[in-house]
Amino acid sequence: MAAGPRTAKAALRRRIRRDLLPREYGGQGLPYEYQRAFDEESRCYEMPLILNTPTFTICCATLLDTAGEEQKKTHIGAALRGEEVLVQLLSEPSGGSDLAGVLTRAERRGDRWVIDGAKTWSTSAFAADYGLCLARTAWDVPKHEGLTMFLVPIDHPGITLRRITQVNGSSEFCEEFLDGVDVGEDAVVGEVNHGWAVASRQLYHERRAVGMGSEFASGGGSEGGHTTPVDYAELARQAGRADSDWVRETAGRALVHRAVAEQLIEHVYRSVSDGTLPPAGGTLIRLFHAETVMCEMDTALAIAGAAGVVGQPGEGLQAGLRYLARQSVAIGGGTTEMARNVIGERVLNFPREYAADRGVPFNQVRHGQAR
């Protein structure tokens, strides 16, 4: 079944939807096992990526943890009805992995907030209705203490959106320029100047989503087959290497990696739920997912050989096109290096890495060569 907005809305209207979300917000309030069963049964069907990630697995999950009751009823309910798509507006052109160092500013003017700045690498923002936008609202305090999260309408006239074309031809990411975007007090998620608490939960859900371990995902199918696991038997046949012992051995190693990744998702979910692991333990899924995908992409290209060479669109095997985006899996949802830091500091309780700007008011922190 082909995926798309109409397919998504039809599925949601027929109650093929997020089983775990509470009934008061439009979900079914069922145990995790129900969602897992649905995911298995729906694996052969496509599911629009933007509904799973970032709408439900990241944004709705974050609102469920941090938003006010009216925001939950309004936005989670609309998303479940297929009427609203939510995205993240977090990363910035100048920010790199330092999310707390955002430069997008929000100033209070009367009973309104006016937001100015730039965001980038926003997944599927071109199709979104609202974005969770992290902005700086206080500059004379350390960087983590002066942030506020806002729900911003993407169609606001002050937002200019551009799609980013990647090396593999995909244009799912966008960059946004915010100029005088005014929103009311009801757009604030959580508390003013306490947006890092909201962002931290958002990052937690993002890492689980990127690692394919979110309990709020619905359906195991991909959109357009772009994330469908590699069929090594078919790939070997297409490459003319179906009888190779080396191919069978190499593919077997990758499949073991895949099986371990699937079991890890279940183990980490249970361990975080019962308190055996801290919430940051979800980052284990994100890290191992990246290692698994890179292993599979390397294996697929090795099996494809010259048939994996990418020329014009539509030429060659899918293995080559996928390989072009290989490194992105080590960046999305926070870099692999950041994931290792989180695991070391918050799961294994290693000493924190030194940071020169810790405890320093943000307006006194050096940015490039400026102060």
Where do the PLM segments sit?
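A short, Trp-centered hydrophobic/proline-enriched beta-strand micro-motif
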Residues: 82-90, 133-134
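Internal helix-loop-helix
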Residues: 12-83, 124-130, 213, 258, ...
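Short, charged, amphipathic alpha-helical segments
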Residues: 248-253, 280-287
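Glycine-rich phosphate/pyrophosphate-binding beta-alpha loops
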Residues: 95-96, 120-125, 167-168, 328-333
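Alpha-helix capping/hinge segments and adjacent helical runs
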Residues: 12, 122, 283, 287-371
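A structural signal for short hydrophobic beta-strand segments in well-ordered beta-sheet cores
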Residues: 104-107
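Glycine-rich beta->alpha junctions and the first turn(s) of the following alpha-helix
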Residues: 159-262, 329, 365-371
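A short core secondary-structure module
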Residues: 112, 116-162
